[in-house]
UniProtKB/Swiss-Prot annotation:
The lineage of its organism: Bacteria, Pseudomonadati, Pseudomonadota, Alphaproteobacteria, Rickettsiales. Belongs to the class-II aminoacyl-tRNA synthetase family. It is found in: Cytoplasm. Tetramer of two alpha and two beta subunits. PROSITE patterns: AA_TRNA_LIGASE_II_GLYAB (PS50861). The keyword Protein biosynthesis applies. Gene3D superfamilies: Bira Bifunctional Protein, Domain 2, Class II aaRS and biotin synthetases, domain 2. Keywords: Aminoacyl-tRNA synthetase, ATP-binding, Cytoplasm, Ligase, Nucleotide-binding, Protein biosynthesis. One of its GO terms (cellular component) is cytosol. GO terms for molecular function: ATP binding; glycine-tRNA ligase activity. This is Glycine--tRNA ligase alpha subunit.
C-alpha cells in the first residue's frame, strides 16, 4: 500500500469522521497552543446540546522552539481534533478504525492505550485520558472531557487528538519531520514538509527565544486581560475568549523567553484560568 502524504493523512481523517457524521470545521484563526483551545472544543463541550466536529488546528508552543533543528519538536505543528458529545460507547473502536484507514494494520502493529489523565491548568480543563502509542511512539491523545473552565461537562465529551506530524513520521517511515512527503507528488511538484514550514520555524524560533520584547508582551497580556473582562460585562463571551487566547499566547511567549519566575508563572496561570472560566460561564449562561 502506498504511504499517505501529509495532506492525504488529513484528507483521510476528514473523510472518515465526515462519514461518521462529524461537521468538518476550519482551523481557528488565532494563536493557540493545541487543538483543544479552539472554541469549538472549549465552549461547545459545555451544555447539553449534542456536538460532533472534527478539524485541523495549527498550534504554537514558543517554548518548543528549536530553530528547525530538532527531528520532531517544533514551535509550530499540526493537530487533528475530534469532539464527540456525548461520547459514544464505541469511541475507542471508532478511533482504531480510523488508524486502519490510514494504512496501519492493527494485527501487526502494537497499539497501546497508556493511562495519562489530561489537564490544562490555563483552561481549567481536565479529563480521564490515555496516550495512544504505536510501536512505542505516541501518536494520539484520547480524553473523556470532564471539566472546562472549572465547569463540569454534562454530558461528558470524547476528545481525540491526533498529532499529525508524529503520526506522519510513523506512517511514512522517516526520522525527521522536515523529510515528510507533504503532497504526494513527484518531480517539480513534489514538496517536503521542510520546504513548507521550516524557514518559518527557524525565524520564529529566533523571535521567540531572542527577539520578542518582554515589556511589550507584558503590556499585551494586561491589555487582553482587561479587554476580556470588559467584553464579558457586555455579554460577548466569544470575542472575550479571543482575548483570553491572546493573553495565553503572550504568557507562553514570556515563559519561552525565561523572564517569568516560578512564582510569577503560577500567578499568570491563575489569571489566564480566570479569563477562561468567565468566558465559559458566560457562554453557558447564554446557551442553556
Amino acid at each position: 500500500m502506498k504511504k499517505l502524504s501529509f495532506q492525504q493523512i488529513i484528507l483521510t481523517l476528514q473523510n472518515y469522521w465526515q462519514d461518521y457524521g462529524c461537521a468538518i470545521l476550519q482551523p481557528y484563526d488565532a494563536h493557540v497552543g493545541a487543538g483543544t483551545f479552539h472554541p469549538a472544543t472549549v465552549l461547545r463541550c459545555l451544555g447539553t446540546k449534542p456536538w460532533s466536529v472534527a478539524y485541523v488546528q495549527p498550534s504554537r508552543r514558543p517554548g518548543d522552539s528549536r530553530y528547525g533543528m530538532h527531528p520532531n519538536r517544533m514551535q509550530h505543528y499540526y493537530q487533528f481534533q475530534v469532539i464527540l458529545k456525548p461520547s459514544p460507547d464505541n469511541i475507542q473502536e471508532l478511533y482504531l478504525k480510523s488508524l486502519e484507514c490510514l494504512g496501519i494494520d492493527l494485527k501487526i502493529h502494537d497499539i497501546r492505550f497508556v493511562e495519562d489523565d489530561w489537564e490544562s491548568p490555563t483552561l481549567g480543563a481536565a479529563g480521564l485520558g490515555w496516550e495512544v502509542w504505536c510501536n512505542g511512539m505516541e501518536v494520539s491523545q484520547f480524553t473523556y472531557m470532564q471539566q472546562i473552565g472549572g465547569i463540569e461537562c454534562r454530558p461528558v465529551a470524547g476528545e481525540i487528538t491526533y498529532g499529525l506530524d508524529r503520526l506522519a513520521l510513523y506512517i511514512q517511515g522517516v526520522d525527521e519531520v522536515r523529510e515528510l512527503d507533504w503532497n504526494g507528488q513527484v518531480g517539480e511538484k513534489a514538496l517536503k514538509y521542510g520546504e513548507v514550514d521550516f524557514e518559518a520555524e527557524r525565524q520564529f524560533s529566533k523571535y521567540n527565544l531572542e527577539l520578542a520584547d518582554s515589556e511589550m508582551l507584558l503590556r499585551h497580556f494586561k491589555d487582553s486581560e482587561d479587554q476580556c473582562e470588559r467584553l464579558i460585562k457586555a455579554n460577548l463571551p466569544m470575542p472575550a475568549y479571543d482575548e483570553c487566547l491572546k493573553a495565553s499566547h503572550a504568557f507562553n511567549q514570556l515563559n519561552a523567553l525565561g523572564v517569568i519566575s516560578v512564582t510569577e508563572r503560577a500567578s499568570y496561570v491563575l489569571r489566564v484560568r480566570h479569563l477562561a472560566r468567565i468566558c465559559c460561564t458566560k457562554w453557558l449562561e447564554m446557551n442553556k
